[in-house]
From Swiss-Prot:
Naturally occurring in which organism (per UniProt): Emiliania huxleyi (strain CCMP1516)
Keyword Ligase part of the UniProt annotation: no
Gene name of the encoded protein: ALMA5
InterPro entries: Asp/Glu_race
Protein's name in the database: Dimethylsulfoniopropionate lyase 5
Upper lineage: Eukaryota, Haptista, Haptophyta, Prymnesiophyceae, Isochrysidales
Root EC class: lyase
Length: 504
């Protein structure tokens, strides 16, 4: 397997399609050079070729493709997320303002801190948040300088690095030095697509989440794939792939995979398969703790926490942190977005307590005039704080916020059980949820994706994917994404959690 894992077909648990942009050199992409007429034509042709293959998302094989993110998303209705850097807004939201993220690049002599911050601001971060991402080049290691990468004649040049212990040690030593220089470092983001083969080594050695081109690709695929844990098995063409992933992940779950902590509001109900609080919604272990006094009504209103609520929330988070194997904390109510800032201040672990955090990924993935549906249990309850929630997710510009449309499910037959704290009949409710979304999409023909804000809506995600044929993001796609950054990669890596690499 080549070290440039992003282009290796064995790096994924799903099918990939490649299209080459003729005449677009690595040096041009690295420098963010303005595309010539012929290069722009070649780029359009490559995008068209991928669309013709029916791909569900488009990414790139070079982190510097971020320079052309805006151009490509105008060329297609398919979500385009060309660089691992598009994960940055999610990371910025998960961690405290004082905490930093290390960004590894091939060569920081031609992609320095200023260039990184400029790109991050362009994709939606504030200057203050962009400065939290600290660039670290590897040009001092043989093979990583821009000139050496540009001179690679074929991927066989890189085939040896996977077995090079010397190279691994040099990379780990560089990260260790960066950690000493930045004690507030909490995660690693690999801008370089040459590096995912070393992600497991970084996770094992540093003990922090590592986000790369593969975590991004897996996340994008999940938004358009039947969920093998609780999905509908509607689309047989993707189900076999999803089940293959499930079999691999079941093997992982029996081993030493990390756990996710779930911060629960003070609200008792019987969760359905697919709900955040339902243990079988995941292929890994979860731990739950209740913030006593932080009720559903309080979360909806989003008022500042009382002293008692703050104490209860912090206590629950502390217990989750202390639980064995927990590597991150989510929440069981989308309205907890109102308290995302509070949660991340209380914890040294990444906090991602609302599905709303994914809104920026949607805004960045599609053309500026394309729109999204946000399904919620009650539209009137979400509306008052909706703009503030979007801003917390780094969707700050009024024109971008206007692309998100609330769709309340309060009148769907049978869904009132959610408000009553009763068991939901998923089979009964599904047709109503689908009909509601289809009608809304028909009224808004520019709708390109759906976000399920409510943590009791993921059971309907597969039915929506099938009916609308567009990506659906929910609390489960978010939790799986963050978990993957701390998990032994089942397709390649160093097997540091003793997981099975046997594909069933």
């Amino acid at each position: 397997m080549p070290a440039q894992a992003v282009v290796g077909t064995n790096s994924y648990l799903f099918r990939t399609v490649h299209a080459e942009v003729k005449g677009l050199r690595y040096l041009d992409v690295r420098a963010g050079k303005e595309l010539s007429v012929s290069q722009k034509k070649a780029l359009k042709e490559a995008v068209k070729e991928l669309d013709a293959e029916g791909v569900v998302a488009i990414t790139g094989d070079c982190g510097s493709f971020v320079h052309y993110q805006t151009a490509v998303r105008r060329m297609t209705k398919t979500p385009a997320v060309l660089s691992p850097l598009l994960q940055a807004p999610l990371l910025a939201t998960m961690y405290m303002k004082e905490e930093t993220i290390l960004v590894l690049t091939n060569d920081s002599s031609d992609y320095d801190q200023a260039a990184l911050e400029s790109n991050l601001v362009e994709i939606g971060l504030s200057q203050e948040d962009a400065a939290r991402f600290v660039i670290q080049g590897l040009q001092h290691i043989e093979g990583f300088s821009t000139s050496e990468v540009a001179d690679m004649s074929d991927e066989r040049t890189w085939a040896m690095v996977d077995t090079s212990e010397r190279l691994r040690l040099e990379i780990m030593s560089t990260i260790e030095a960066a950690k000493k220089a930045n004690p507030s470092l909490r995660a690693i983001l690999l801008e370089s697509t040459l590096l995912p083969s070393f992600s497991d080594s970084m996770r094992q050695t540093r003990g922090v989440p590592v986000f790369d081109a593969i975590t991004l690709a897996d996340y994008l695929a999940a938004a358009s794939t039947d969920n093998p844990r609780f999905g509908s098995n509607i689309d047989a063409s993707v189900w076999s792939s999803a089940m293959e992933r499930a079999n691999v992940m079941d093997e992982l779950s029996q081993r030493a995979t990390p756990a996710i902590g779930i911060l629960r509001i003070d609200y008792s109900y019987p969760p359905a398969p697919g709900d955040v609080d339902y243990p079988g919604s995941y292929y890994y272990r979860t731990v739950q703790e209740v913030a006593a006094g932080l009720t559903f009504e309080a979360a909806q209103e989003g008022r500042p926490l009382t002293a008692q609520q703050r104490e209860a929330m912090e206590g629950a988070i502390r217990r989750l942190e202390a639980a064995k194997g927990v590597v991150g904390i989510t929440g069981d109510c989308g309205f907890l977005m109102n308290y995302q800032v509070d949660a991340r201040r209380m914890s040294h672990l990444p906090c991602f307590i609302s599905a709303m955090m994914q809104c920026h990924m949607l805004a960045a993935s599609f053309a500026a005039d394309e729109e999204f549906l946000v399904l919620t249990a009650n539209g009137k309850s979400l509306a008052p704080k909706f703009g503030e929630m979007l801003s917390l997710a780094h969707v700050t510009r009024p024109e971008d916020q206007a692309r998100f449309h609330i769709l309340g499910c309060e009148d769907v037959d049978g869904f009132d059980a959610v408000a009553k704290g009763e068991a939901v009949d998923v089979a009964r409710v599904t047709p109503g949820i689908v009909a509601l979304a289809k009608a809304a999409a028909a009224r808004r023909p520019k709708v390109r994706a759906v976000l399920l804000e409510c943590t009791e809506l993921p059971p309907y995600a597969d039915a929506l994917r099938h009916a609308l044929r567009i990506p659906v993001l929910d609390a489960i796609t978010l939790v799986d994404f963050v978990h993957s950054a701390s998990t032994d990669n089942p397709a390649f890596g160093v097997d540091f959690q003793k997981s099975s690499k046997v594909f069933v």
